[in-house]
Structures are given as C-alpha cells and as structure tokens.
C-alpha cells in the first residue's frame, strides 16, 4: 500500500468572540477557541463512496479505518494506494483487482447514512462493503496494567480537548503498550483513526485494544468487532444491546473506566 498525503494539516481550532453572561446577569465580551469542522469526499476506485465531516488531523488513518470498520477491507494488502489532495478535501483510494467487480450501475440505490454522533458523515456507495457478517473474536483476558495506562493517558488530556472541550479521544494499544492517540469531533471518527493507524502499521488486530472517551452503543461495538479488535474500553457506559452484541461475538468490553476503577460487562467469568 502506497500513501501519498499532500495535505498539510491546517489549524483545527479558531478564536471566536461572544458575549459571556454570568449568573448575576453581568455581561462581558469574551474570546474562546472553537473546533473547526472539515469536510472530505472519499473516492474508491473512482466512485464517490463517502462524505466525511471530521477534525482535520490524521486523515489517512480516518479513511482507511472507516473502510475497515465498514467492512470494505481488512488488510493493507487490499489497498494499492491512498491519495489525499493538498486541501484535504478529496481522498482517492485504489483497491486491488478483487474489488473491481463490486461497482454496479445503480449507484442511487446504494445511498445510506452511517452513524456519526455529531457529524454529517454519509456513505454514498456501499457496494464495496463485502464483509457483511461479523466474525467471532478470540476472547482475551483483561490486563489491569493496560487499563491503568489507558486511564492515566486519558487524564493527561489531549491538546484539542484541552483547548476546546469539544473532541473525543481514542487510544490504541498494541501488545499491551499504548502506541497511538488521536482526537476528533466525532467518537466514530476517532475510533476509525485508531483502526486506520493499526492497518497502516500492519498490526495484528487481535493483539490490539482501544480506549475511547465516547459512549459504547451498538454502532461503536460493531466497528470494533468488524476490525477484529478483541478489547474495547471507555470512560462511558455501553447500552444493553451493545453488551449483548459484545458477549455474542467474544468482545471484552470495559466501561466506566476512570480513576483506576472500571466495570467489565462481558467475559468476566474467564
């Protein structure tokens, strides 16, 4: 896989001035830093496939991670090249010959929305999503050392969140060590960036674990299972349906993980 990233990352935060009113009714003009929204169209084999709204950081990982979590690819060997233009508004992905027959003539029938939390992400053409069925994971045991490392990394805060309080973070561990962290306006995007980083570095997904600052509903759990990552942790709580899905597919799920405390929702009998 070749990656040609022409985009020089732009500022993700901008100053905005407004009128601050305190509880006593006093008003004063005040400036603060706000997060920007970046839009990018993703073309796969020359077909407009996704429209992403994101924080303009780590764009190659976002594109590749989204392709993994949507079931389009599962290894870097399936991707011939990824190109991102100098403005970061257009990405082009060329897949290998095994994917070339997936484009059909009725693109309008393939329009669908994707889970986005607080962004306007859309999947325009879903014909490249070849991995329809989720695969059962090989369960893993929880490493308290890693869970505490996630907790400590989270409490050190991330630059954009510290400046704006507007981002979600995701941390990726490989073989028990944290190797990557990222931020995005959407929790789904942050997770996809971590998945994409693992793909770009040819990590065995089964030896990875992720920590997210976002909630864990079914759509987030589906992404983790589809990537083949056997452990997910969050400072938030999951939904009841997400716990059932994680249990069914052998995903170890940790929630309410902060201050060296946590709740293990699945596979805790092991």
Identify the residue ranges that each predicted region occupies.
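Histidine- and/or cysteine-centered catalytic micro-motif in compact active-site loops
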Residues: 175, 183-185, 215
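Alpha-helix initiation and capping sites
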Residues: 164, 185-188
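Short alpha-helix boundary/capping segments
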Residues: 54, 182-186, 238
């Amino acid at each position: 896989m070749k990656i040609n990233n022409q985009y020089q990352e732009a500022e993700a935060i901008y100053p905005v001035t407004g009128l601050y009113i305190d509880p006593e009714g006093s008003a004063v003009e005040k400036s603060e830093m706000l997060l920007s929204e970046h839009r990018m169209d993703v073309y796969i084999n020359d077909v407009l496939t996704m429209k992403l709204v994101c924080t303009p950081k780590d764009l190659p990982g976002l594109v590749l991670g989204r392709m993994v979590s949507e079931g389009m690819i599962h290894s870097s060997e399936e991707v011939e090249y990824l190109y991102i233009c100098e403005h970061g508004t257009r990405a082009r992905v060329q897949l290998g010959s095994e994917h070339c027959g997936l484009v059909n003539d009725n693109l309008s029938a393939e329009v669908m929305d994707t889970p986005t939390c607080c962004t306007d992400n859309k999947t325009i053409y879903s014909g490249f999503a070849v991995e329809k069925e989720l695969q059962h994971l090989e369960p893993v045991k929880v490493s308290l050392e890693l869970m505490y490392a996630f907790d400590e990394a989270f409490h050190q805060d991330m630059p954009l969140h510290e400046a704006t309080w507007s981002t979600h973070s995701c941390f990726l561990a490989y073989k028990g060590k944290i190797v990557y962290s990222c931020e995005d306006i959407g929790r789904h995007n942050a997770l996809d960036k971590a998945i994409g980083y693992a793909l770009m570095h040819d990590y065995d997904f089964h030896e990875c674990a992720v920590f997210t600052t976002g909630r864990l509903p079914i759509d987030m759990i589906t992404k983790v299972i589809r990537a083949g990552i056997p452990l997910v942790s969050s400072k938030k709580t999951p939904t009841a349906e997400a716990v059932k899905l994680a249990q069914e597919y052998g995903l170890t799920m940790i929630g309410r993980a902060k201050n060296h405390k946590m709740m293990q929702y699945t596979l805790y009998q092991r």
